């Protein structure tokens, strides 16, 4: 006989705890104020506007380094979330404090398409190749209108290898 499905509240709590734990591992994410909107297995990064993010006060425009960091954060968290998803859904990842290591950036190329205005920004990453050792990601950022990107990037990442117990 099959086990009855878990209540949806339990599943949502487990997913939210895992995402919070994943984000909490990177202090710079907290400093920038980046959060993630989760819809099923899809994540959207949210960079709430703050005065400290302005790089050019004359325009004003979001600093290019902040834009780049936001895109890279969205890429790394999306890769990590995708790697966790199967364990999370099967219940194998019960403790929200034990996560695999994060992917390491090999290279990251940003295209600045227009100035980031002094308002909230959003980003979504798409994994274009995911292997055991290497992954490629394309990420896009927008503000008011998703069809008007202000930046996009392509990144290549070294995927973490499973830890081997030597007992």
Model feature map: region roles:
Residues 1-167:
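Terminal targeting signals and extreme-terminal segments of soluble enzymes
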């Amino acid at each position: 006989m099959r086990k009855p499905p878990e209540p949806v509240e339990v599943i949502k709590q487990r997913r939210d705890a895992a995402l919070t734990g994943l984000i909490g591992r990177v202090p710079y994410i907290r400093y920038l104020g980046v959060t993630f909107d989760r819809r099923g297995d899809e994540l959207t990064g949210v960079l709430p506007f703050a005065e400290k993010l302005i790089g050019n006060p004359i325009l004003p425009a979001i600093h290019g380094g902040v834009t780049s960091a936001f895109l890279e954060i969205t890429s790394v968290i999306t890769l990590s979330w995708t790697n966790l998803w199967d364990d999370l859904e099967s219940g194998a990842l019960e403790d929200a404090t034990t996560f695999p290591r994060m992917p390491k950036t090999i290279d990251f190329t940003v295209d600045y398409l227009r100035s980031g205005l002094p308002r909230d920004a959003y980003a979504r990453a798409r994994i274009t190749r995911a292997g055991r050792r290497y992954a490629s990601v394309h990420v896009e950022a927008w503000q008011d209108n998703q069809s008007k990107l202000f930046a996009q990037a392509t990144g290549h990442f070294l995927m973490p290898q499973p830890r081997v117990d030597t007992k």
